A protein has these predicted regions:
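Cys/His-clustered metal-coordination modules, chiefly Zn-binding fingers
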Residues: 214-322
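Domain-scale terminal segments
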Residues: 1-223
Length: 322
């Protein structure tokens, strides 16, 4: 580890002039995945899935220490993909950019994700799984945007009076004042909001087989497990602690957050592999999709080709027949 009395300038000089780590000399070292909150790190799915590094907020860690921690990650892994939600504080987001600026490193990707907190945690774990595959750091970073389209993230809410992430009409707002009212909201990939009731259909779910992650707040409702999960034909249900940012994100603490996702690393690998790879014209990093995960430079439209059709289906993830 770095000694605490080393200045930020000395650390930055090490990054710019020092010998690059094993990840860039031919040996296999996973790309580091980093997060801005510890509760975005779900338990690993297997013994091979690495954990994620924590990039702490400015009110918790001094800038020089944050620079030192990032320098260690770069030394150990070569590249860092930092994933953070849209809901973090402006000061925390500025800290991420400050650290990258001081280090003057082109090996740090800052990936901002517009998903609810539990959805972000699910995405982070998928990236952790992919980090040990034979994908370049650029592909891992740009895979985040691809995978968000395959995470159906939402919540069961007891009120939508303070919820502003999905358009809510006045009639629905009025109904939320009725005692016992509950609403099922899907924030992405396609926004949906329905009032929960005996005759109401659940929101439209994924057209491929998934697992379902749930996290309870101050709600004891079993609707997600008893109604939504069967309707979405999920293969397995898992429970997690509610992320600390979830009540603020959803506008209420009386909720059950959920996220349907692809659990199988082989399917994730196939999905990412099915997309055409390009080299960023600006930083030369490898990428998939329409934007570089490291420098955010867009790919010219004529070069953006997706080839994911036919990769996913309920049958593709169905459990083997005994």
């Amino acid at each position: 580890m770095l000694r605490q009395n080393r200045g930020a300038g000395a650390i930055a000089a090490d990054v710019m002039t020092g010998v690059r780590p094993e990840a860039e000399t031919g040996n296999s070292v996973p790309t580091a995945i980093a997060v801005t909150s510890a509760d975005l790190v779900l338990p690993p799915t297997d013994q091979q899935t690495p954990t994620a590094a924590l990039l702490q907020a400015p009110d918790v860690q001094a800038l020089e220490m944050a620079i030192g921690d990032m320098h260690v990650l770069l030394e150990q892994h070569g590249y860092v993909v930092a994933v953070y939600p849209t809901g973090i504080s402006p000061a925390h987001e500025r800290r991420l950019y400050s650290v990258r600026s001081v280090l003057e490193s082109d090996r740090i990707a800052l990936v901002k994700v517009d998903l609810p907190p539990l959805g972000v945690a699910v995405l982070v774990r998928q990236l952790r799984q992919l980090s040990i595959c034979d994908f370049s750091p650029g592909v891992v970073a740009s895979a985040a945007r691809l995978l968000t389209h395959y995470i159906h993230a939402g919540a069961l809410l007891h009120s939508v009076t303070k919820f502003d992430r999905v358009p809510v009409d006045l009639r629905t707002h009025a109904k939320s004042w009725v005692p016992g009212s509950q609403f099922a909201v899907v924030a992405g990939p396609e926004p949906q909001l329905v009032r929960v009731g005996p005759k109401a259909d659940p929101p439209t779910g994924p057209e491929f087989a998934t697992h379902l992650m749930t996290a309870k707040g101050q709600s004891q409702s079993e609707w997600v497990k008893e109604t939504l999960a069967p309707a979405w034909q999920v293969q397995s249900i898992h429970e997690s602690a509610l992320p600390s940012e979830s009540p603020a994100w959803w506008g209420t603490g009386k909720l059950v957050e959920f996220a349907a996702y692809l659990p199988d690393i082989s399917v994730l690998y196939q999905l990412v592999s099915s997309v055409r790879r390009e080299n960023c014209r600006w930083c030369r990093m490898e990428l998939i999709g329409d934007r570089c995960g490291f420098c955010s430079s867009p790919l010219p439209a004529a070069e953006h080709r997706m080839h994911t059709a036919g990769v996913l289906s309920h049958e593709a993830l169905a459990p083997p027949q005994s």
